[in-house]
Structures are given as structure tokens and as C-alpha cells.
Amino acid sequence: MNPANHSQVAGFVLLGLSQVWELRFVFFTVFSAVYFMTVVGNLLIVVIVTSDPHLHTTMYFLLGNLSFLDFCYSSITAPRMLVDLLSGNPTISFGGCLTQLFFFHFIGGIKIFLLTVMAYDRYIAISQPLHYTLIMNQTVCALLMAASWVGGFIHSIVQIALTIQLPFCGPDKLDNFYCDVPQLIKLACTDTFVLELLMVSNNGLVTLMCFLVLLGSYTALLVMLRSHSREGRSKALSTCASHIAVVTLIFVPCIYVYTRPFRTFPMDKAVSVLYTIVTPMLNPAIYTLRNKEVIMAMKKLWRRKKDPIGPLEHRPLH
């Protein structure tokens, strides 16, 4: 097909999860609850980490940032998906599609780099506990966080730069509930073989490099923990287990989607729902379920909300 003979499409039709109204209503009900829990769970962690002085440490600073990013990440796709499920008219403009694509990869890239920073933080905390506060000081922490944001921005800009030059002259039906590279690139009315290689290389490089760093960090930690006491080993494994669970939930779907040729497989939409909608909801529960410090901070916040003036004996007499 010669793109010169066809006009550029004004937008795309998102095919979504289903065309059947009854199924769309069920999906709307379920994912509304999931998104509500995502917002409440992640923002609650941000509030707790910010308000409790005992949690003003590097580990909880990074956790608070991850929760904020999970809230943003889910908000890029979930609200629009919910509206489209009810409206039955899931169209998105070309500019809106590129905007969603940019922020999706921007926040997603930051999360990938941040998880790598969190693994490094745990490695230093366990391998060099006496020097931990010197190595992971506020300046280093801020620089690593800034590097994660810059890395996410560069990664996203590459995606946009490679996509925006493509001619889209029809068809305009995008087989997903949000705009992403694998589905979008298949609608281009030109040969995209070289472009697919570039995008797979870019996504694969970011994902696999970070995953290998994480794998190396935790392999070294597991070897190191053999020499620790039972109590120290148990506490370290508890912290690492939470992080490994989150890493698995994020990296495995990303590797499945972005490090292979852009072809459609039956599991694609289910995997997309997992890492864009479900995983951001699970992360707060995974990190707080066995974390005594966060649970204590939650209880303090709840008591403060119930009794904002303070205990009866400390109230002023009038």
C-alpha cells in the first residue's frame, strides 16, 4: 500500500475487552472496584510515608514514590477504559493516543528503573548495614530518583519519536483498551520491520538490563544471607520477598509483551489487564501485609483520624 495515496486517520477505535454489553457491564463493575482500591491503597501509603517521621528513611521514601507511580500508571489507562466500557463509543484522537502512549511509557520506564534502585538499596542495607546511611544518603537517593525519571523520559521519547513518523491511513481499529506500541505499529500503512526491531531492541534493552541487575542483586543477597543469624535472615528475606513478588508481577508481563515480535496472541489482553490494572492494586498489599512498621503507622493514622484532638487526659480544660 502506498501511503501517499491515502489520507492520515484522525483517530482510532479502541476495540477494548469485549463488544458484548453484558460482559462490558461486568468488566466495568469489577475494574471500577479494582481502580478504587488502587487509588485508595497507593495514596494511603504515600500519606503514611509522608506523615510518619519513623518512616522517613530511604527504603520508605522509595516505596512512597513507587506507590505514587502505581497510582499514576493505573490512572493513565483505567479511567478511560471504564468510560469506554459504559459508552460503547471507544474512540481516541491521534494526538490523544500519542499522549497516552507517552505517559504510559514514561511512568512505566520510571517504575522499571525505580525497582532497580530499590533492589540496590536493599543490597546495600543487608551487605553493608554499618555504612548504609553513609552510602544511601539523601543526596544519593535524590540523584538515583532523578536518574529514574530521566531514564523513563528518554525511554518514552524514543517510543514517540519512532511512532510519530509512521503513516496511519487505515484501518483505524486498535485491538486493545489503550494505545500502545505493539497494537499501534500494526496499523501503519508501510513496512515496519526495521522499526519493530528498533522498538523491540529499545524495550528489551531497558527491561532485560534492569531485570539482570535485579537478578544479580538478589542472587548475591541470597548467598550473603547464609552467614546471617536466623532472626536477621528472616527479616531480610521478608523484605526481599515483597520486592521480588512486585518485580515478578511487573517484569514478567513486560518481557512477554515487549521483547518479542509485535504479533497478536490470545493472552495479550489478559496480560495487559494484569500489569496495567491489577498489579498497581496488589503492590500496596504486598508491601504492607507483613510490614510491621507500615501497619503501626496505619494504626497511628487511624487513631489520629478518630481522635484528632488527642487523648482525653491531654485535652485542655475549659
Curated annotation (Swiss-Prot):
Residues linked to a glycan: N5
- InterPro entries on file: GPCR_Rhodpsn, GPCR_Rhodpsn_7TM, Olfact_rcpt, Olfactory_Receptors
Q: Where in the cell is it found?
A: Cell membrane
- Keywords of the record: Cell membrane, Disulfide bond, G-protein coupled receptor, Glycoprotein, Membrane, Olfaction, Receptor, Sensory transduction, Transducer, Transmembrane, Transmembrane helix
- Which of the residues are on side Extracellular? 1-25, 80-100, 159-195, 259-269
Record's superkingdom?
Eukaryota
PANTHER family reported for this sequence: OLFACTORY RECEPTOR
Membership in a protein family: Belongs to the G-protein coupled receptor 1 family.
Task: Quote the protein name from its UniProt record.
Answer: Olfactory receptor 4D5
- Organism annotation: Homo sapiens
Q: What is the lineage of its organism?
A: Eukaryota, Metazoa, Chordata, Craniata, Vertebrata
